[in-house]
């Protein structure tokens, strides 16, 4: 389906209710950022109303300028040394069983922010024994030593998004590469982690390219895959090529499952952390974290 008015299947729930207001208050009181807000996630209303949010660490200014992403780009401020404790406190106040953490890319830092990542994971775990921690990290410019700092903090699920097909990596993810993303996922898998990745539809990809991307993710052992519709944040971002219909998302889900990816969340409004807790239950993550 070529681009025209946004179809009815992309209508999202508007933010409202006591759960939404509580999350907003906790985030504001702890001077934190969420990718829900920064990336203009269409599911913010639904997730916040359920009392969940994806907390974004290392500030809200990214050193990269990906043409699909709404997160602000520029020169980040100095590191906030109090951030790990405040994130841990926010997780406690939200009473989360499954915590999703992400960050901007910090290519200005030698380790890409890996030490901060490790400190946040450990602080959340110390303050919230039994919480399952899912991380959605940048690629640390392919530096496996930095990646290992994060993995050594022992998150329960490691997520790193492929985002799009190989041909579109350079125009869409200027500072990332297809092979580097697969290498990061492969390294996490080699260390025994449950791994997760995601791709978007509607940004200019072809059908055979989607299939190849899913096969490549399966080859590096990805356990969980998310597939969602690309939504253009502003007119200056990459244009929407088409609106993929719900039945296409269902078809790609069936394909991914058929080649060995164990859990697939696929639909127009699906984003990386959408229904993350439910996905992780397939792997007994919550039970293992609370043991």
What are these regions (language model features)?
Residues 65, 109, 168, 235, ...:
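Glycine/Thr-rich phosphate-binding loops of Rossmann-like dinucleotide-binding domains
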Residues 3-10, 46-83:
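Canonical Radical SAM [4Fe-4S] cluster-binding loop centered on the CxxxCxxC motif
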Residues 60, 138-141, 204, 269:
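Short, surface-exposed acidic/glycine-rich loop or hinge patches that mediate macromolecular interfaces
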Residues 18, 22, 36, 57, ...:
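Generic alpha-helix structural propensity
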Residues 67, 170, 208:
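Alpha-helical elements of the RecA-like P-loop NTPase motor core of helicases
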Residues 1-54, 89, 93-95, 119-131, ...:
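Auxiliary Fe-S-binding modules of radical SAM enzymes
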């Amino acid at each position: 389906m070529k681009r025209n008015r946004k179809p009815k299947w992309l209508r999202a729930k508007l933010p409202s209710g006591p759960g939404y207001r509580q999350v907003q208050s906790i985030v504001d009181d702890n001077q934190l950022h969420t990718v829900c807000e920064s990336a203009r996630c269409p599911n913010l209303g639904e997730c916040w109303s359920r009392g969940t949010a994806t907390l974004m660490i290392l500030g809200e200014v990214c050193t990269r300028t990906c043409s699909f992403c709404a997160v602000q780009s520029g020169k980040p401020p100095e590191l906030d040394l109090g951030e790990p404790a405040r994130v841990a406190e926010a997780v406690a106040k939200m009473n989360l069983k499954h915590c999703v953490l992400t960050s901007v890319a910090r290519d200005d830092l030698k380790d890409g922010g890996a030490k901060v990542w490790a400190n946040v994971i450990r602080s959340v775990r110390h303050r919230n024994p039994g919480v399952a921690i899912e991380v959605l990290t940048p690629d640390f410019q392919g530096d496996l030593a930095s990646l290992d700092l994060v993995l050594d903090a022992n998150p329960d699920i490691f997520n790193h998004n492929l985002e799009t097909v190989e041909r579109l990596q350079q125009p869409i993810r200027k500072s990332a590469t297809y092979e580097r993303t697969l290498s990061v996922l492969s390294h996490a898998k080699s260390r025994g982690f449950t791994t997760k990745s995601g791709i978007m539809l509607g940004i200019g990809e072809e059908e055979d390219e989607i299939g190849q991307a899913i096969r490549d993710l399966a080859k590096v052992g990805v356990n969980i895959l998310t597939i969602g519709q690309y939504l253009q944040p502003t007119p200056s971002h990459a244009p929407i090529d088409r609106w993929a219909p719900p039945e296409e998302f269902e078809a790609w889900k069936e394909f991914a499952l058929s080649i060995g990816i164990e859990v697939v969340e696929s639909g127009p409004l699906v984003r990386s952390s959408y229904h993350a807790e439910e996905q992780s239950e397939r792997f007994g993550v919550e039970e293992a974290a609370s043991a």
